[in-house]
């Protein structure tokens, strides 16, 4: 280690310079550089407040604002050099400010610590990302309503335990995903409300003795208010964990959709045709059309879940207040945001180019005793207790399996061997169309209910 005295902005207490290996290991500028515009905006608001409170002069404020603007312009132009020796985005910008305007620049950090400064930058960045995620979720929801409108009235099998269960409208299935992503949207907005409190002015962890005005800075930066406890503010990363939890849920929903698209596109199902532009081929098998984009979306769920686990594990044992461990919060969040944003965008695009094979979907409802529940409901309407009706239909299904036929293939006489209350009107309820149209309960797959739900969804996404 060199004997040279530290030249860091915080280096007054140190007699030796930081080792190069330590500098490389501890730097964060390689990734927190994306926060630069928030750091500059926060510094401008902070400087303005310091001037208003008489802590710096109007002339110094003017120099600081001009210096920060010139730094931002250089960053935007790609000519600003970020250096690992200055560790992070804050120190790079502050050092550049001091280099450009001299003593006035060294007055900017009064009543501020990097602890509350990074929390400010991070929250402002996440706030913007929440707004962007809402736009992407709206786009995904819009895609589901467009597909739903296109195939309104078409029927496919619904599944439980990956076995054919009951017939449903394709639109009903698409609206199920619409509901998932609307909940995701609500969660993001709810998360945004909680993170929209300014931490600036809490300083390192105990507040400051200087006569600052936290509310002025919060208002200038668009925050709803200020945080209430300086120790909690310095220690807090709930907002990062909460948002990443929301992102994990979004990617989970995307993964479930992707899994269905992969399955439905197989030769065994043939329910959907994913556009060639969202598939790839094989390097050895000429016939292959692989649903790689859907598979990648499904696969990326692992890295988003990993980001959440990383954050939770990093925070679980930290005493109050700030610890350097918290520097490790940003990369997982950045990666989760980037991954989910890209996945949402390409999912909406892929859905817009996907086609359902409606004939094949309808054909799949003709086997697997998919209207067995309808027969049980029919018996209930004939005053047969449901458990008895369930047993009767189960016996009929077993007989059909032995005979190698489906329920609609039985004659009325054969039906009546299982229950004498069965009449000729039974065959109307054993069709997929009859089954779907009977599901008129709120939230059900009946055409009337689905049309109502689709119209409401279209209104919510701005189509109708």
Swiss-Prot record:
The keyword ATP-binding does not apply. SUPFAM superfamilies: L-aspartase-like. GO terms for molecular function: argininosuccinate lyase activity. GO terms for biological process: arginine biosynthetic process via ornithine; L-arginine biosynthetic process. Transmembrane segments: none annotated. The lineage of its organism: Bacteria, Pseudomonadati, Thermodesulfobacteriota, Desulfobulbia, Desulfobulbales. It comes from Desulfotalea psychrophila (strain LSv54 / DSM 12343). Keywords: Amino-acid biosynthesis, Arginine biosynthesis, Cytoplasm, Lyase. The keyword Nucleotide-binding does not apply. Its EC number is 4.3.2.1. The gene is argH. This is Argininosuccinate lyase. GO terms for cellular component: cytosol.
